[in-house]
Amino acid sequence: MYRRFFVRMPKKKNVTSVLEVMDITTGQRSVVKEFPFLIEAPNWTPDGNWLVYNSGGKLYKLSPESPGEPQLIHSDYATRCNNDHVISADGKQIAISNGTKEDGRSRIYTLPFEGGVPRLITPLGPSYLHGWSPDGKQLAYCAERNGNFDVYVIPALGGEEKRLTTAEGLDDGPEYSPCGQYIWFNSVRTGLMQVWRMKADGSEQTQMTFDETRNSWFPHISPDGKQIGFHHLYKR
């Protein structure tokens, strides 16, 4: 049984966030917890025991089965975390995108899942994390370099980044397939935002959605690699 999560935010002056999970087979939804403030980007841990989300620049974890008070994931000086964070396949580490105090630009860091001092991975910014390879060796992210946003990869321990896309316009949301052979992403290169797929080395970039009325964003691949979920936004 596959379950997805999402945050529903009613249109009120005072924001209320509703964290829900959904059985994608039956469509049944259930509320995990309501918050009288904004939370974003809940991620399942690989073992399914926790949902990790960001709020107010910090990261928290919450049990979907017995939600009590959320537990803070201590990240030391990294207190400007945005909604781009990913958990490693072994569940031992979490990678975050955090706005640095020096220039406000988002950079990528890693830290133990239980909390700790972050390790800077991308000295250059802005960099927005989206994917972690199944073998734990590479991170995939969207970054702006020289005026264009493209997909990059970098060793998870730090090192030289590699640019994978060169099309004009925004290439964003890269995520590895469970087999590690592909990276899925979204690109506006054909006019509307569409879902694309390429090999992990950047070759064979192939358009996967062809919707003429809606923009398609942020593909997420099911653990068995047989399905993807993504956002649809109607064009204006």
Predicted regions and their residues:
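Sequence signature of WD/YWTD-type beta-propeller architectures
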Residues: 1-236
